[in-house]
UniProtKB/Swiss-Prot annotation:
Family: Belongs to the lyase 1 family. Argininosuccinate lyase subfamily.
Enzyme superclass (EC): lyase
Enzyme Commission (EC) number: 4.3.2.1
The protein's name: Argininosuccinate lyase
Entry-linked SUPFAM superfamilies: L-aspartase-like
GO BP, one annotated term: L-arginine biosynthetic process
CDD domains: Argininosuccinate_lyase
Keywords, ordered alphabetically: Amino-acid biosynthesis, Arginine biosynthesis, Cytoplasm, Lyase
Length: 481
């Protein structure tokens, strides 16, 4: 029976109501965090002489036993509502209410669960960052391998300009790099302590909030008690990051599906990430990319659901907030699975260099450089050059001839001239690529420089990540030893 019902409400509660309101199904995500929170709070109560050292030590020792036992071995009676009451009930069974009942002094489940969520989520954010770093490293290997592999870039999914496949991969690395930065920034706002805010107005007991902050490895405290128990913006921010990353990853999945089709035929997805048809024996379907693309789209829905739950809630704690948690954890685990799938597919793709080169050499992908050459060599305005080359392309299509066959005629009509060498260079797709060696360009030496720059950033990320993981591990070691 839930000990909270002995007073005001009485012991009777309908079974369907208990099952409807319990959060035990998803409280497994905060079980260890709740133990840490309990130990830190009890330690502080001892130090502040709010409870006796004797009682406090008994509580802490029993909490460590519960941690070793694991949540799955506890009495998960739905009438207990949540993991907080399950743990407190276990303590009372072993120590009696006169001892165990002192642990919750000066604390509410409101600040307790807010603390637990932050403790658990900070670990998951670090895990996500770790997976992203691994994926980024693998993408850089692919980019380096193909820094001279000629291909064509697209706008509107229409062939646009020559690039290298290494440069194309770096475009995704660049986006992932921003995602990593966003998660690191969010970590700082997750890692602040609401513990000590109590129900919503702190407490008359002489608590030391800075001490529990220190014990739990938080960077700071949320000072305002009402904000402390109600704030879930750190969850929304994390889920927004997850949604943005999911959108970036979905673009990769889309390219894997499209570029591996027979019509494009520029890459081949490894067999282990594909399936065949139940009726068409020739088929090699990009199922993993498709399923990943679909799963990533659900992340947007989870974010909107959480925002909708939170919209217009009265200030401080409302039980509605409980329903945020399953959407958060589903987003986290879906994202981690999808990162690993995308990483695996990118790391194992086969690149059809000949097909990529063939695509770059047709459909007028060098037209922009031809216009640029007219500007540089003939001194005309770019808009005029744009019109001349546009006319060349139009005539080439209509008359079914190569640009080389009619360019001299068109230039002469416009009182312009170019040497054959300049024309050949302008129309050569790889020469186009080599010319584009400005920062962020596709020239092989610039791609190589960019890869080196990203590797330097990764080294910094890894150091930062290792430092934060060590901080979290130290908290666990100190409190659970």
């Amino acid at each position: 029976m839930n000990i909270l019902r002995r007073g005001r409400l009485g012991s009777n509660v309908k079974e369907d109501v208990m099952k409807f309101t319990t959060s035990l199904e998803f409280d497994k995500e905060i079980f260890e965090s709740d133990i840490l929170c309990d130990i830190a709070h009890t330690t502080m109560l001892i130090e502040q002489n709010v409870i006796s050292e004797e009682n406090g030590k008994k509580i802490i020792a029993e909490l460590k036993k519960i941690a070793e036992k694991g949540m799955e071995n506890l009495d998960l009676d739905p009438s207990l509502d949540d993991i907080h009451m399950v743990i407190e009930s276990e303590l009372i069974k072993e120590l009696g209410e006169d001892v165990a009942g002192r642990m919750h002094t000066g604390r509410s489940r409101n600040d307790e669960v807010a603390t637990d969520l932050r403790l658990s989520l900070r670990k998951k954010v670090l895990e996500i960052i770790g997976h992203l770093i691994t994926m980024e490293q693998n993408m850089l290997k692919v980019s380096n391998e193909h820094k001279e592999t000629l291909t064509v870039g697209y706008t509107h999914l229409q062939q646009a300009q020559p690039v290298t496949f290494g440069h194309h991969i770096l475009s995704h690395v660049s986006a992932i790099e921003r995602d990593i930065s966003r998660f690191f920034d969010t970590y700082n706002r997750i890692n602040i302590s609401p513990l000590g805010c109590s129900a919503m107005a702190t407490t008359g007991f002489n608590l030391n909030r800075k001490r529990t902050q220190e014990l739990l490895g938080f960077y700071d405290i949320i000072e305002n008690s009402m904000d402390g128990v109600s704030s879930r913006d750190f969850i929304v921010e994390t889920m927004a990051n997850i949604s943005m990353l999911g959108t970036n990853l979905s673009k990769i999945c889309e390219e894997l599906v499209v570029f591996s089709s027979a019509e494009f035929n520029t890459i081949e997805i490894a067999n282990e990430y594909t399936s065949t048809s139940s009726i068409m024996p020739q088929k090699k379907n990009p199922d993993v990319a498709e399923i990943t693309r679909a799963k990533l789209s659900t992340l947007n829905g989870e974010l909107v659901t959480v925002l909708t739950i939170m919209k217009a809630l009265p200030n401080t704690y409302n039980r509605d907030l409980q329903e945020i948690s399953p959407h958060l954890w589903k987003s986290v685990y879906t994202l981690i699975d999808c990162i690993q799938m995308v990483d695996g597919m990118i790391s194992t793709i086969k690149v059809n260099k000949e097909r990529m080169k063939e695509n770059a050499e047709k459909n007028y992908s060098t037209a922009t450089e031809l216009a640029d050459t007219l500007v540089r060599e003939c001194g005309i305005a770019f808009r005029m050059a744009h019109g001349i080359v546009g006319e060349l392309v139009k005539r080439s299509i209509e008359e079914k001839v190569e640009i080389k066959e009619i360019i001299l005629e068109v230039l002469e009509k416009n009182n312009l001239s170019l040497s054959q060498e300049k024309i050949d260079t302008a129309l050569d797709p790889f020469e186009n690529v080599k010319l584009r060696n400005v920062i962020g360009g596709p020239a092989p030496e610039e791609v190589e420089r960019a890869i080196s720059s990203f590797n330097t950033k990764i080294s910094t990320h890894k150091e930062k990540l290792d430092e934060k993981i060590a901080e979290v591990n130290t908290v666990n070691k100190n409190l659970l030893k």
